[in-house]
Amino acid sequence: YNFCTNYLAGDMSPKKYWKFKEPYEGIHKLDKRIEKNLELVEKFVQLGVPRKHIIISGHSCGGLLTLMLLAAHPDKVGGGISYMQACYGKLSKKYKVKKVGPEEALAKFAKKYPGGAELRQRQINNIKKSSNVPVLAFTHPKDQYEGLLSDWLEEVPGVKRIIISEDFKINKKTCVMKGKDWEENISKQKSPGHKMNQADCFQFYNPLK
């Protein structure tokens, strides 16, 4: 559902995404998505679904949205699952986090896109301010987006972070992505670390009985 709300645009130009230098003014599209998700939650509750049985989940930008929603409204649902939260491009890869470290990499990002960097940090700070964020957060160190910029999750009360693996296997099982008439080792995909939750090996975290 998070991705079905792509028609929602923030108050600033939707074409800018994070590539703006001025401080973000108005309501960001992620905040608008939160409101739409909360509206959907209330519809389910009105149909008789217990709040504690409703779990919000999202991948990438949807993963960040999940964290933001649960930080602001921890009692509205039973909890959340965030997969590879990221909404500001391939920061780990582009700014060479592994080589220069998070601090220097984020400083370079802030120099190039001060508005985007400020908004990202503001969102993180708001999440960290919450007294309880009941979210299971999956990250991968080889995620080109924020794989090496996710340690802040360890500071968020209520968040349980799972670092999936150090390579493209889970529990020694090779990870394969499958479609209707194709399958491919995830290591051959673009941004494989960002897609680990879409591979068959990820079933390890939700074993079939």
Where are these regions (language model features)?
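Cap/lid segment of the alpha/beta-hydrolase catalytic domain
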Residues: 4-31
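Primarily recognizes the serine-hydrolase "nucleophile elbow" in alpha/beta-hydrolase
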Residues: 43, 47, 52-100
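Structural recognition of the beta-strand scaffold that forms the well-ordered cores
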Residues: 1-5, 53-57, 79-83, 135-138, ...
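Alpha/beta-hydrolase active-site loop
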Residues: 21-48
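Solvent-exposed loop/turn segments at secondary-structure junctions
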Residues: 7-11, 60-64, 86-89, 141-145, ...
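Solvent-exposed, acidic/flexible segments
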Residues: 27-34, 59, 63, 116, ...
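The feature captures the conserved acid-bearing segment of alpha/beta-hydrolase catalytic domains
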Residues: 87-164
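C-terminal catalytic histidine-bearing segment of alpha/beta-hydrolase fold enzymes
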Residues: 157-209
